[in-house]
Amino acid sequence: MLSPKRTRFRKQHRGRMKGISSRGNHISFGKYALQALEPAWITSRQIEAGRRAMTRNARRGGKIWVRIFPDKPVTLRPAETRMGSGKGSPEYWVAVVKPGRILYEMGGVTENIARRAISLAASKMPKRTQFIIS
């Protein structure tokens, strides 16, 4: 699973996802891509599940690029803990994705193989996405 090697701070505020993605919203490596249509936090597990689904479906053919990286720590408090006594400890990592962001790219395969592989990855994502061609 993806996570940063080291970070400047252990914990982060949740923040909010306003507007559309201004970066990473064009295909730059492959020919086909999966684009987010709604704002979401995508966990490192979901990113990995999507990547695995695509690689298994493509079967050695083509190349896959993962265009997002989980760099935001999400903290959780233990179950049945009273309020107070500080913020919880970091449990997992998420990538903050705004509408328009490219999640995965694929190249070196035919369109129908890419469509099938990318639709499998899309089913692993928590929000609506679309298939695009450069």
Curated annotation (Swiss-Prot):
Coiled coil start-end: none
Stretches with biased composition (Basic residues): 1-17
Intracellular or extracellular location(s): Plastid, Chloroplast
Keyword Cytoplasm among UniProt keywords: no
Top-level taxon: Eukaryota
Record GO cellular component, one term: mitochondrial large ribosomal subunit
Annotated spans, Disordered: 1-22
Pfam family membership, one: Ribosomal_L16
Family label: Belongs to the universal ribosomal protein uL16 family.
Protein name (Swiss-Prot/TrEMBL): Large ribosomal subunit protein uL16c
